[in-house]
């Protein structure tokens, strides 16, 4: 891995950050023309490291410009600090980490727009707290894709709000987390016995929107009653192997009996 070029700027502004980035790219022999998108990560102090690592991993497959804004205290004096990474862990991407206090703690369009790649799609990701209506957020309005996470959003009934405010271009990681599971269930329905499913039961943690979505998806696709069962209910006997995926167990009930799919480990559903 090549040694990264990292610049630290304190008490700075967008113009100075953009100038420093241009100088780094020129010195490193890099061109932004190969970047496929700008990923804007709107994080909060204490909830940024996981999102930052995920963005860096994704950038190795999809070279991009990553802008991470970490909100600090709104009540502190105004201050904007920045780190600019070119090469190293940023791979073929450019990584800009902004830390804002006071008025700079709010990731406004004026703050972010001067750092965006020209003529490239914009993806905005709220890894923790998201607006009630992401498409109406100032940054959400300029983005082609808006990513939220109902599982981590402290907003009460975040999934309900995502549904009510859905706009084309919205994505929620609660749905993405059950993509492998949906594939397994679809495959199971193509196997004997070739009988109609008359009822289904979905098991998972109480406060898990992925499990809610899984139950709703089955009900919509199969047109049958689906019972959503909380495995953290003391009345539910838990298997030692469970609690590793959002949907821990599903029972597809047919006239001849039930087909049971269980999460065996973090990678296997059987």
Where on the chain are the PLM-derived regions?
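An N-terminal, globular interaction/scaffold subdomain
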Residues: 1-125
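C-terminal structured domains
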Residues: 24-28, 215-220, 227-270
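Short, surface-exposed beta-strand/loop "edge" segments at domain boundaries and coil↔beta transitions
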Residues: 47-50, 208-209, 255-263
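A short acidic (Asp/Glu
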Residues: 51-52, 108-109, 134-136, 210-214
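Structural alpha-beta junctions
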Residues: 58-68, 116-123, 141-147, 219-232
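Acidic, Ser/Thr-rich peripheral helices and adjacent loops at domain boundaries
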Residues: 81-88, 140-153, 240-260
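Internal, hydrophobic cores of structured domains that mediate oligomerization or house catalytic pockets
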Residues: 94, 98-186, 198
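ATP/pyrophosphate-binding catalytic subdomain of soluble kinases
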Residues: 174-231, 249
